[in-house]
C-alpha cells in the first residue's frame, strides 16, 4: 500500500533531493554508492523501474495519486510518497513537474568500458558535451538507432541529471553507458588507446581536409566502430581528431556546414549503426 505523506514542512530533510541538493551533491562522487538521481514523468519513472533501479521516494501532485501516475505507486512498494498541490510543489522545486510526479532513485554502480564494449560493434563516444538536453537527445537516438553503448569522457554532462533523463524519455536506462577515463587528462590519449585495445576503429565526426563521407563503404565494413562526437560550440578537440582512425563528415546542402550535435548524432547513428 502506498505510503502517502502530506507535505507540511518545506524544510524537511527528506525533501532535500527535490528541493535543495545540487546535481553534484545528488551524484555524490565521494560516495557513489549513496548517489541519487531524479526521474520525471510516469513514462520515464516506469522505464527506470523496468531497468531495476530501486526507488527511494516520490514527489507527486495530490491529484496524480488517483490519476495517470497511480500505476507507478503500485510498483514502488513502501517508498514514501510526498504530496501537495501543484502550486506548492512548484514552489518547493522551482519548476513545474512534468506530468505531476518526480521519483528519487539510487544511482547504479559505475560500469566499466571493458564490460560494455566486449561484445559491442557500434558505440557512441561523447566528448565534453555539457548541455543536458543534447545528452538526453543523443541517448534517445542511440537507443533507437542501433548503438550498443555510449561512453562519456569526464567533462561531459552526467547522463543521469534530471533534464538529460527527461529528454531521453528514459532511454538512458536502456542503453548501457560508462565513463571513459577517470580524469579529463585521460582523454583523448588513454581513452583512444583503450578503444583501440578493445578492437575498435574510431571515427571523429568533424570537418577537415581528410574527412570522408559518412556513407563511405569502408566505414560500413568496420566490424567495431566508435563514433566520436564533440561539444556543441567548438566540436572535437584537434588532438581527438588526430587520434581517430577516420574523420567523418555529413554531406549538406545550401551552404550549411554543421548540425547541432544531437541532430548530427541521429544522422551518424542511422548511417553507421546499420549492421
For the regions a language model picked out, list residue spans one by one.
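Anion (oxyanion) recognition and catalysis
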Residues: 49, 75, 196-197
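Short, aromatic/basic amphipathic alpha-helical patches
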Residues: 67-78, 240
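Boundary-proximal intrinsically disordered activation/regulatory segments immediately upstream
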Residues: 1-68, 156-157
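Active-site/ligand-binding-proximal alpha/beta "capping" segment
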Residues: 203-254
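Structured adenosyl-cofactor binding patch, chiefly the S-adenosyl-L-methionine
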Residues: 103, 141-145, 159-173, 238-275
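RNA substrate-binding interface of SAM-dependent RNA methyltransferases
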Residues: 5, 109-210
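A glycine-rich helix N-cap at a beta->alpha junction
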Residues: 75-94
Amino acid at each position: 500500500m502506498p505510503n502517502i505523506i502530506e507535505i507540511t514542512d518545506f524544510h524537511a530533510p527528506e525533501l532535500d533531493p527535490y528541493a535543495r541538493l545540487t546535481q553534484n551533491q545528488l551524484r555524490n562522487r565521494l560516495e557513489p554508492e549513496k548517489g541519487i538521481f531524479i526521474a520525471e514523468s510516469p513514462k520515464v519513472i516506469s522505464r527506470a523501474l523496468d531497468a531495476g533501479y530501486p526507488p527511494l521516494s516520490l514527489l507527486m501532485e495530490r491529484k496524480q495519486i488517483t490519476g495517470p501516475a497511480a500505476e507507478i505507486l503500485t510498483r514502488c512498494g513502501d517508498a514514501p510518497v510526498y504530496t501537495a498541490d501543484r502550486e506548492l510543489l512548484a514552489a518547493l522545486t522551482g519548476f513545474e513537474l512534468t506530468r505531476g510526479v518526480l521519483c528519487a532513485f539510487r544511482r547504479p554502480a559505475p560500469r566499466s568500458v571493458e564490460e560494455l564494449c566486449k561484445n559491442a560493434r557500434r558505440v557512441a563516444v561523447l566528448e565534453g558535451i555539457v548541455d543536458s538536453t543534447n545528452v538526453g537527445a543523443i541517448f534517445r537516438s542511440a537507443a533507437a538507432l542501433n548503438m550498443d553503448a555510449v561512453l562519456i569522457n569526464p567533462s561531459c554532462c552526467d547522463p543521469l541529471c534530471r533534464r538529460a533523463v527527461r529528454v531521453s524519455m528514459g532511454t538512458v536506462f536502456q542503453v548501457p553507458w560508462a565513463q571513459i577515463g577517470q580524469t579529463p587528462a585521460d582523454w583523448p590519449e588513454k581513452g583512444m588507446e583503450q578503444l583501440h585495445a578493445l578492437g575498435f576503429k574510431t571515427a571523429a565526426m568533424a570537418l577537415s581536409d581528410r574527412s570522408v563521407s559518412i556513407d563511405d563503404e569502408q566505414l560500413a565494413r568496420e566490424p567495431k566502430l566508435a563514433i566520436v562526437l564533440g561539444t556543441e560550440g567548438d566540436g572535437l578537440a584537434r588532438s581527438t581528431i588526430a587520434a581517430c582512425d577516420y574523420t567523418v563528415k555529413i554531406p549538406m546542402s545550401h551552404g550549411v556546414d554543421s548540425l547541432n550535435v544531437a541532430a548530427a548524432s541521429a544522422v551518424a547513428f542511422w548511417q553507421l549503426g546499420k549492421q
